[in-house]
């Protein structure tokens, strides 16, 4: 009996040591980085919904969440690059919406809506946009944490970085703006007139 008890104690001790030296890692380390936010700006637990924005706790940036609801946040809508002065207005494609779309229009309408309680939304910089890239995502999917950004498309997303010289076929158009391709995480420069996707950002605090 004493021998069996000693073996049991030794086994338990070994398991405790193993657990200490090799702690179980979360299934998705990315999940602790993101915080779901409601339309009114209230945080949600990871399993709750619906959510309209996502807070990146590493950078302090708050991101728009794209939808399939045929409104201004619809993931299929595309935009030409325009900031009110530079660029080309109204060359995007906004389904089921009168007129065409550009990035300035999307920023203006999102701020008027006070998405997630904020009215200082803007187009992200290239560096900010690349913080969303998750290269561990399986091939064939958009390179982003889809559990928090389920509607981001495999395609080009505009940044705010502009006046960048174009090369090759587009060189005759002069300059354009940077975009990040969520198929592979690569940065490219596109003509302002091109229709690309858009995800807006603001600073949480």
Protein language model regions, located:
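Glycine-aromatic-enriched surface loops/turns that form tight recognition elements
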Residues: 2-6, 10-122, 126-205
């Amino acid at each position: 009996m004493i021998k069996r008890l000693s073996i049991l104690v030794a086994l338990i001790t070994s398991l405790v040591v193993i657990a200490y030296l090799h702690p179980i890692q979360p299934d998705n380390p990315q999940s602790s980085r993101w915080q779901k936010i409601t339309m009114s700006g209230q945080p949600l637990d990871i399993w709750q919904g619906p959510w309209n924005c996502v807070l990146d706790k590493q950078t302090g940036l708050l991101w728009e969440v794209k939808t399939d609801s045929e409104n201004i946040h619809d993931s299929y809508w595309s935009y030409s690059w325009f900031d009110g002065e530079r660029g080309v207005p109204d060359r995007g494609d906004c389904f089921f919406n009168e007129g065409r779309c550009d990035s300035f229009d999307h920023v203006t309408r999102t701020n008027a809506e006070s998405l997630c309680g904020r009215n200082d939304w803007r187009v992200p910089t290239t560096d900010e946009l690349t913080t969303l890239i998750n290269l561990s995502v399986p091939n064939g999917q958009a390179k982003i944490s889809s559990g928090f950004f389920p509607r981001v498309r495999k395609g080009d997303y505009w940044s705010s970085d502009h006046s960048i010289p174009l090369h090759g076929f587009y060189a005759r158009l002069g300059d354009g703006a940077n975009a990040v391709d969520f198929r592979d995480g690569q940065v490219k420069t596109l003509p302002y007139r091109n229709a690309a996707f858009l995800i807006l950002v603001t600073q949480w605090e």
